[in-house]
Amino acid sequence: IPVCPRGSVRCQVSLPDLFDRAVMLSHYIHSLSSDMFHEFNKQYALGRGFIPRAINSCHTSSISTPEDKDQAQQTHHEVLMDLILGLLRSWNDPLDHLASEVHSLPKAPSALLTKATEVKEENQRLLEGIEKIVDQVHPGAKENKAYSVWSGLPSLQTTDEDARLFAFYNLFRCLRRDSHKIDSYLKLLKCRIVYNNNC
């Protein structure tokens, strides 16, 4: 995804190709998200007791998702599509701010800055790709535009250093968690829709 040459009007990419691109992109986003979490953890979070404070504190916790792979297998593909779209949209705003605020970290590693910007851009590309998939799988379907609103910007900008580092830690942790869910659901959908569960 970018799916079509710029300016092309009647460009139609096949569903298997759209899924291939989306799965590659979601896998890459999850890989970048994991890298960022580990880099942040190593440099800023060790010994600060963030783990017990972070339980159930993602802004997307209100989006009810399957508990495990078995539950995901039992979930209708339209529901999984809506979950993916909801999660991706829920990250647009926080990723924007993460990319612009991460430079304020003391001695922010350049790799962290680069990856934060890249994840922001790739998340938007993936969202556009999933919207194209939905158009092909359910043409004319009324799309669910629901997503979770993030209100964590003041925490990323607070002068309380411990609270600020925890806000970054939690955002990286939740991003890693949600990018893994998106990647898993997409792979499951690709298997189900493109290969008729023969994979």
From Swiss-Prot:
Record's keyword terms, sorted: Disulfide bond, Hormone, Lactation, Phosphoprotein, Secreted
SUPFAM superfamilies attached to this UniProt entry: 4-helical cytokines
SS bond list: C4-C11, C58-C174, C191-C199
PROSITE patterns registered for this protein in UniProt: SOMATOTROPIN_1, SOMATOTROPIN_2
Main location: secreted
Pfam family for this entry, one: Hormone_1
InterPro entries for this protein: 4_helix_cytokine-like_core, Somatotropin/Prolactin, Somatotropin_CS
GO biological process: female pregnancy; lactation; positive regulation of cell population proliferation; positive regulation of lactation; positive regulation of receptor signaling pathway via JAK-STAT; response to nutrient levels
One Gene Ontology cellular component annotation held by this UniProt entry: extracellular space
Phosphoserine modification, residue list: S26, S34, S90
GO molecular function: hormone activity; prolactin receptor binding
Subcellular location: Secreted
Entry similarity comment: Belongs to the somatotropin/prolactin family.
Subunit structure: Interacts with PRLR.
PANTHER family: PROLACTIN, SOMATOTROPIN,PROLACTIN
Job description of the protein: Prolactin acts primarily on the mammary gland by promoting lactation.
Protein name: Prolactin
Species: Loxodonta africana
